[in-house]
Amino acid sequence: MHSFTSFALVAASLASVAQAHFQLQWPGARGAFVANDEVYFCGAHNNVTTNRTDFPLDGSGFVSIKSGHAPYTVGAIISLETDADAWEDFKNSSGGDQIAIAYRQVDNSGTYCVPFNPSSLNIAGIQDGANATIQVVYTGGDGNLYQCADVTFRTTVANLNSSVCTNSTGGDDHSHSSSVTGSTTASAPSTSQTANAAIPFDRWCCYHPWLCWYLRVSPVKTLKGLLLSLPYPCNAFQ
């Protein structure tokens, strides 16, 4: 019974971690959504899609995500490379991330939408007909998650309904409208480290002190070995 209780506690903790994910709603994401792959560059979709989304330069564009976790920090970086398939493609001339959308903290789960006007970035090459990749960077407190959207900039985009850029709260975000806002004072997560690096046990304890204490005093020492062997995305805090 003692072993079963210990296992149940670990399972519950890992289940809570699994809920920290998001899905890119618009523009269309590069490749199919796989929750476990979000810890990798572009959600493990390195190849640029041939089916790019037309993205307006007239200020009517937006980026919309759906989060299953709160609170979280989210922002976006951008590359104007035709085949953006590496972190270096999202760097500016100084070697820093080329920011498209400033990082902000959001306190509610559900749909979150940010108006985005690429023309306001003053980045050379942003013009009608140019290809680009927008990479959304998200962290729910346990590491970075990523999804990419390959776009082609257009002066205007017909039939784009910007009124769908709304926010909602809660797990069922189909009926709960809200004036959710994000603070743009959040610090930018690091995007330069290995996304699936194993987290040291002592750092894991920082996130789950109650469970860590239990494992230290529990006779079921094999659970600690199990946890140490798990690849755990914690690069945002290294």
UniProtKB/Swiss-Prot annotation:
Residue ranges of the propeptide: 197-238
Primary localization class, coarse: secreted
Alphabetic keyword roster: Cell membrane, Copper, Disulfide bond, Glycoprotein, GPI-anchor, Lipoprotein, Membrane, Methylation, Secreted, Signal
Annotated region described as Disordered, given as residue ranges: 168-191
Cysteines engaged in disulfide bonds, as pairs: C42-C148, C113-C165
Pfam families named among the record's database cross-references: BIM1-like_dom
Localisation: Secreted; Cell membrane
Binding-site positions, Cu(2+): H21, H69, D142
InterPro entries assigned to the protein according to its UniProt record, in alphabetical order: BIM1-like, BIM1-like_dom
GO cellular component terms listed in the entry, alphabetical order: extracellular region; plasma membrane; side of membrane
Residues annotated with Methylhistidine modification: H21
Cofactor note: Binds 1 copper ion per subunit.
Transmembrane stretches, start-end: none
Sugar-bearing residue positions: N47, N51, N92, N131, N161, N167
Cofactor(s) the record lists: Cu(2+)
Topology versus the membrane: Lipid-anchor; GPI-anchor
Record-linked PANTHER family: HYPHAL ANASTAMOSIS-7 PROTEIN
Function according to Swiss-Prot or TrEMBL: Lytic polysaccharide monooxygenase-like protein that has diverged to biological functions other than polysaccharide degradation since it does not perform oxidative cleavage of polysaccharides. Acts as a cell surface-bound protein that functions in the copper-accumulation pathway. May also act as the major cell wall sensor that regulates MAP kinase-dependent hyphal anastomosis, the fusion of hyphal cells.
Family: Belongs to the X325 family.
Record-given protein name: Lytic polysaccharide monooxygenase-like protein X325
Annotated gene: X325
